[in-house]
Design a protein with these regions (language model features):
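Short, basic-rich loop-to-helix N-cap that marks the start of a DNA-contacting helix
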Residues: 44-54, 63
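A short, Lys/Arg-rich alpha-helix, primarily the initiator
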Residues: 1-18
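Residue-level signal for the short linker/turn that defines the boundary of a DNA-recognition helix
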Residues: 10, 20-21, 47-50
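Short alpha-helical DNA-recognition segment
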Residues: 20-39
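Alpha-helical residues within the helix-turn-helix
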Residues: 17, 28, 57
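Short, charged recognition helix plus adjacent turn
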Residues: 2, 57, 65-76
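DNA major-groove recognition helix of helix-turn-helix
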Residues: 12, 41, 67
């Protein structure tokens, strides 16, 4: 099981798209810049814990649900 720097962004993008949200909407709800979210989703910037927490809540998820999804992605 190897952690990939793009994994966090991949999972966030997947969950955002599943909910039919734009980057603009999600970033606004999470209180972060859209460009920051873009960099996270592209894997060029790693979010800190607080940012992951804000994004999870904006997606109406528990942060642990995002982590669980990352674990699933690692297994595939």
């Amino acid at each position: 099981m190897q952690f990939d720097n793009t994994l966090v962004g991949k999972v966030i993008r997947k969950k955002r798209e599943q909910k039919g949200m734009t980057q603009e909407l999600l970033s606004g709800l999470a209180g972060i810049a859209r460009t920051h979210l873009t960099m996270i989703e592209n894997g060029t910037k790693q979010p800190n814990f607080e940012t992951v927490w804000k994004i999870a809540l904006a997606l109406e998820l528990k942060p642990s649900e995002l982590v669980e999804e990352m674990e699933i992605e690692l297994e595939d």
